[in-house]
Amino acid sequence: MFNRDMNIADYDPELWQSITDEVQRQEDHIELIASENYTSPRVMEAQGSQLTNKYAEGYPGKRYYGGCEYVDVAESLAIERAKSLFGADYANVQPHSGSQANAAVYQALCAPGDTILGMSLAHGGHLTHGSHVSFSGKMYNAVQYGITPETGILDYAEIERLAVEHKPTMIIAGFSAYSGIVDWAKFREIADKVGAYLFVDMAHVAGLVAAGLYPNPVPFADVVTTTTHKTLGGPRGGLILAKANEAIEKKLNSAVFPGQQGGPLMHVIAAKAVAFKECAEPEFAVYQQQVLDNAKAMVKSFLARGYKIVSGGTENHLFLVDLIAQDITGKEADAALGNAHITVNKNSVPNDPRSPFVTSGLRIGTPALARRGVNAQQSAELALWMCDVLDAIKDEAKLATTITAVKVKVAALCKACPVYG
């Protein structure tokens, strides 16, 4: 029998110290990685529940194990809430991650060796959109499209040309580092022209879509996937959505289980259900508007200080800072800002002369920043502090002094806007 007083701190103090250190880091550092967010105590409560003990292979009402009557309720709630949130007819809440959701879509709609057309990782796509280092680039004949380097905007004429030339089985729309608005209808038009499936990965903008602040791809795509963290702010996991299509729905269900996964993580599915309920609340839309406002405010500060923003601005939660003109690598910028307790990630920019391990840019996102209550004015000031660090990066002595000064400002901002009050 387990005693409910059992805890990690007493049993494994070494591990507990790493956990408490990370909790403190999250409170003391400003998080600007576009794919990261803070999840609610309610979501964490579900994830830490006894639902983790239950195996539930199959789907609600059709399981391969007994004793699933209560986890069926949790999964059914998650399914219905996801469908309602995004106006979908079908939802599969079982994928353990966005990448596994994407893998299931490939398995459902393509055969190994089929041609796919997706956004190049170097231009803002994702590993699973056909990168040669991913299963999507190894199992399938991946053709890649990108942005117009001069404008930073998707080149729809080039996408259409590639589609006509290569006749892909599936076209993938979506991104991990693109600050514009995607024209889902145009992608649908191109897919229809060549008889391809249209698969949209909206992992980065799902929260904005749920709040009505970014175009919803569900009415246009054959299949849509997303992660459930990032802008949605839920637990780490994946989600598949679709319009009513019995044949595709059956293929998707079979591709997730037994195709890609065995037993679903019922504690995480319960956490997804909680998160979807939170996303339907009016305050979630207010939060997403703050995400947008903060990103736009930061862009203005960077532009005012002479830094180039890929595409010239942002229409979502993220933007790319191009550091080529300053001869600063993304790697050294990432490290310097990290020393000032500002967490970002290095990122390639269009026509980047440096390797993906070094890069010439930074990807900056505001979901976590807005989550802790930071407003647009504070975000604009934060961006100026970041510019101070970047401006000093070539002068070791000046950089050390600047980092010390910025850390003091960051500490005050974090204290004024705690993650978990």
UniProtKB/Swiss-Prot annotation:
Keywords: Amino-acid biosynthesis, Cytoplasm, One-carbon metabolism, Pyridoxal phosphate, Transferase. The record marks 229 as: Plays an important role in substrate specificity. Pathway: One-carbon metabolism; tetrahydrofolate interconversion; Amino-acid biosynthesis; glycine biosynthesis; glycine from L-serine: step 1/1. GO terms for biological process: glycine biosynthetic process from serine; tetrahydrofolate interconversion. One of its GO terms (cellular component) is cytosol. CDD domains: SHMT. It holds the Pfam family SHMT. GO terms for molecular function: glycine hydroxymethyltransferase activity; pyridoxal phosphate binding. It catalyses: (6R)-5,10-methylene-5,6,7,8-tetrahydrofolate + glycine + H2O = (6S)-5,6,7,8-tetrahydrofolate + L-serine. The keyword Amino-acid biosynthesis applies. Its cofactor is pyridoxal 5'-phosphate. HAMAP family: SHMT (MF_00051). This is Serine hydroxymethyltransferase.
